[in-house]
Structures are given as C-alpha cells and as structure tokens.
Amino acid sequence: KWHKNKKTRRNVLAYKGSLYYNPAKAQVRKLIVNGVKEIVQNYDVDGIHMDDYFYPTFSSSNVNSAFDAKEYRASTMAKSKKSIVTFRRQQVNILVKDIHSAVKAINPNVTFGISPAGNIDNLTSRYSYYVDINKWLNSSDYVDYICPQIYWGFKHPYAKFDKVTNRWMKAAKSKKVKVYIGIAVYRAGHNTGAGSRERREWKSDANVLKKQVQYARKKGCDGFAFFDYQDLKSRTSAKAVKRLKKVLK
C-alpha cells in the first residue's frame, strides 16, 4: 500500500530491482517496532534476534544521491553539514534503540540482539550496512548482545577466524553488551572457503568447529550461535559436530 500511495511512497524505496523499507522514515520505524512489540506481548519468547541488513550497498558514484538522499537533504543533519553516512547510521541507531526500549518496557527479561556481518571494516564502510557498531557494543541502550557472523576458518587468506575474533573482543571495551560468536557449522565437511587452504580446512579438519569454540572462549566471549540448525544434524558435518559437542558439555 505504501509504495502505491503518493503520500507514503517514500516509505518503500526501489533499488536495483528490489523494494526496501526506508529507515529514514519514522512511519517505517514504527511499523518495525510495532511488529516486535506484537511478538513480545503475545508470545512467550526469550528474545528478539535480528540480522543487520538495514540498507542496500551503494557505490562511490551514488552513495550521496541514491535511496534516502531526499530525506537526508531535508534533515537538520544536512543543514548542519553532517554527512549522509552519519545520517544513515543515525536512522539505524534510532530504530535499534526504539526496538530495545520497546522490548524492555514490555518485559525486561526478554533479550534483544543483532547478528552483524563478521568484518568490522565492512560495517564501518561508507557504502553499506550503516551499523554504528562501536556505539552498540559500548552502551546498554541499543542491544543486549552482539553476535558477529565469523563464518571463516583459521586459514582464510584475509579474514582469519582468530584475528577477526580478537578484533571483536577488543571492540567490546565496556562489557555492557555480551558478545556471542557466530560459528559456521554449515561449512564443516564441505569444500568451501576462500582459497585452497581454507577449503581444505573446512573439508578435512574435523576439529575446526571445536577449535573455534575453544579459541573464542579463551578470548572471553560470552557464548556462541551455530548456523545453521540443519547442519547440526547433517551427515556431512557429523564428525565435526560430534567433536564440537565434546567441548560444549
């Protein structure tokens, strides 16, 4: 309805063949918050979990002109010379903070967290995500936990599991927010990854999941999330999962 109505058309934006809710619109944020409230009010849930895809990915040629640029130009942030990147992060911050506040107002025991992409440099890029990760990690106003998707092995050529984990744990300076590490069970036993060394690791090293849990524990993480459920039961990953379970008991 929004996309077809002239008054609300900007609530839903078309970009590269897809339709997106516009985070810069208060009506959009209210819709999402109300959806979360409906769940927490009517169902006995332990938590609300979200991925972090709030904005599409832009390029250097359109980052300042595409998508919600019209809302940015009309904003006080534009008038005060703040960048569109700062504006977009602020829209996401407002949404996340409103969700957290709504959840806690209904039931303080319900947990709210977000599972961002594992590469912090991508999260802080000018062109995508617009996740204010350092603020979220070091404030009690946005999330109860962060669960980075560190879906790489120790042998990844650029994003090695240990180095990425170290960076996340260092970023969580205040300890106000729990850090759970997302583990890629779906890769175990498969010939997958970036480069021959990582592919070999996932395919042949039945200890890879166990070693990731042991390493992250040593660095002080608060827990783990395993993606995805079906691969905890699959034949392909069975050997790695069996060894993983031994360090989870």
Predicted segments, located by residue:
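Active-site-adjacent "subsite" loops/lids of carbohydrate-active enzymes
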Residues: K1-N42
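Aromatic- and acidic-residue-enriched segments that line the glycan-binding/catalytic groove
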Residues: K1-Y15, D52-K79, R197-E201
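Conserved, mostly hydrophobic/aromatic
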Residues: I32, I39, I48-D51, V103, ...
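Short, acidic/polar
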Residues: Q27-I39, T124-D141, F161, E201-R217
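Substrate-binding cleft of secreted/luminal carbohydrate-active enzymes
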Residues: N138-Y158, W168-K249
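Substrate-binding cleft/loops of secretory-pathway carbohydrate-active enzymes
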Residues: H49, F58, A105-I106, T111-C147, ...
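Aromatic-lined carbohydrate-recognition surfaces of secreted/lumenal glycan-active proteins
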Residues: H49-T57, K81-Y129, K176-Y186
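Surface-exposed cleft-lining segments at the edges of enzyme active sites
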Residues: Y21-P23, A74-Q90, D121-L123, Y151-F154
